[in-house]
Amino acid sequence: MSEVTTAEFNEDGVYLRKVRSFVLREGRLTTGQAKALESFWPTMGLDYSPQAINFTEVFGREADTVLEIGFGMGASLVEMAANAPELNFIGVEVHKPGVGACLGEAGNAGISNLRVYHHDAVEVLENAIPDSSLARVQLFFPDPWHKKRHHKRRIVQPEFVELLRRKLKIGGVFHMATDWENYAEHMLEVMSAAPGYQNQSDTQTYVPRPDHRPLTKFENRGQRLGHGVWDLMFERVE
């Protein structure tokens, strides 16, 4: 599970400035991850700056763009990019070994429709992603911060989902997945109250795992043990 951001939120879901140093997320790189960063960052890495990027310039084409927040080691993100060459993918991850692993897998597979940030997700969204530009935002298995006193660290909060709404196109979708039922309920509560979104579930709750989200090894194992996974998909409608 990825912490995806160094942000913290208050009880009303208002984003507070960073509370921990980004440097703490560097982590220890394997030799392979270090080589991947050296080899593939020049072509696939996006250096953060507080100016909005131009997707057409970044990818060399016009295509719908999907952004994933906190991709972990990147295996499912690389698989999605390989399975949907017609889409652009941007991954954001604060854990450097994960960035190296993702770049290595994508680079060695010849993936050309994926770019990666090694930075805080909230800052990337606030400053580097143009408004009304994303076809989909993905948040898969974020840290659930299961202790009640840590719930303010959960990334799905009212102000954050309003930030995402600004970045999604009309018709764009925010897709979440979690294996913590309490966090799924929290996500559903926050999203159902958020203005400008429509739940894509017929029951106004959860949706079956869509084909575009790969089934992870962790998830496969959990399902055999009877563990649940909850997917939520909310469309920006205004």
UniProtKB/Swiss-Prot annotation:
Residues noted as binding substrate in the record, renumbered to the chain: K147, D179, T216, K217, F218, E219
Reactions listed under catalytic activity: guanosine(46) in tRNA + S-adenosyl-L-methionine = N(7)-methylguanosine(46) in tRNA + S-adenosyl-L-homocysteine
Active site: D143
Chain sites annotated for binding S-adenosyl-L-methionine: E68, E93, D120, D143
One annotated Gene Ontology cellular component of this protein: tRNA methyltransferase complex
Protein's pathway: tRNA modification; N(7)-methylguanine-tRNA biosynthesis
EC number: 2.1.1.33
Family membership: Belongs to the class I-like SAM-binding methyltransferase superfamily. TrmB family.
Protein's name according to its UniProt entry: tRNA (guanine-N(7)-)-methyltransferase
Organism: Shewanella amazonensis (strain ATCC BAA-1098 / SB2B)
Upper lineage: Bacteria, Pseudomonadati, Pseudomonadota, Gammaproteobacteria, Alteromonadales
